[in-house]
Amino acid sequence: MAANELASSSVQAFQEQSLGGFVSRKLLLHNPFDHNTQRAFAVAPSPLITHENNLSGNVLMLLSVLICGIICCLGLHYIIRCAFRRTSSFMISEPIAGLSTPCGSSNKGINKKALRMFPVVSYSPEMNLPGLGEECVICLSDFVSGEQIRMLPKCHHGFHVRCIDKWLQQHLTCPKCRHCLVETCQKILGDFSQADQVAATPTASVIVRIAPLEPEGRVNILRESS
């Protein structure tokens, strides 16, 4: 009996020792610190990839800001140009008070016959005419090479033919300097009327009567008898 009890106690002690060693080896194999370290190395991104991502994000943000700025500048420029055009049109069309000339009181435009006598030139950037600028102040558009420009007398300011013709249908002044064109138109129309009068005056007819010649024989007889 004693031998059996000793053998069973020895087997039990051996089993407990074996189980303890197994558990300790298992704990060594499954070290939580090593697992966390491996996970950290596996999850942590590369510094180079992070830098490239940050750089791409900065470039996209910078491009977005530049595009938005350009769009805002273009929109603001368009709004200012439209406002300036409206203001200029209003100032040009506003009648001038206190003028003693007929230009201040007449709403009738220039006679078409006189208007057609104003010179028209073909615009070229190389032209150096006094008073001719680079844009039409009526439509606020730059002159283009080959466009027909009508020049006003006296002030020599130039405008698009379609713009100045429409303007002078209702006004008698230059839209840029307000020079009155009534006197010039009257002079042109006066020259026209004088030319018409000269053309309409009938020329005096001169009647020349030629007497028939007498026969030569009769003349000789008359001379002998005398």
Swiss-Prot record:
Pathway: Protein modification; protein ubiquitination
Predominant subcellular localization, coarse grouping: membrane
Leading EC class: transferase
EC annotation from Swiss-Prot or TrEMBL: 2.3.2.27
Recorded catalytic activity of this chain's protein: S-ubiquitinyl-[E2 ubiquitin-conjugating enzyme]-L-cysteine + [acceptor protein]-L-lysine = [E2 ubiquitin-conjugating enzyme]-L-cysteine + N(6)-ubiquitinyl-[acceptor protein]-L-lysine
Zinc finger (RING-type) boundaries: 136-178
Gene Ontology molecular-function annotations: transferase activity; zinc ion binding
CDD domains cross-referenced by the UniProt entry: RING-H2_EL5-like
Record-annotated membrane-spanning stretches: 60-80
UniProt cross-references to PROSITE patterns, sorted A to Z: ZF_RING_2
Membrane topology designation: Single-pass membrane protein
One BP annotation, GO: protein ubiquitination
UniProt keyword list: Membrane, Metal-binding, Transferase, Transmembrane, Transmembrane helix, Ubl conjugation pathway, Zinc, Zinc-finger
Database matches in InterPro entries: ATL10/ATL72-79-like, Znf_RING, Znf_RING/FYVE/PHD
Pfam families in the record: zf-RING_2
Subcellular location: Membrane
Single GO cellular component term: membrane
Domain comment quoted from the record: The RING-type zinc finger domain mediates binding to an E2 ubiquitin-conjugating enzyme.
UniProt similarity note: Belongs to the RING-type zinc finger family. ATL subfamily.
UniProt-recorded name of the protein: RING-H2 finger protein ATL75
Species of the source: Arabidopsis thaliana
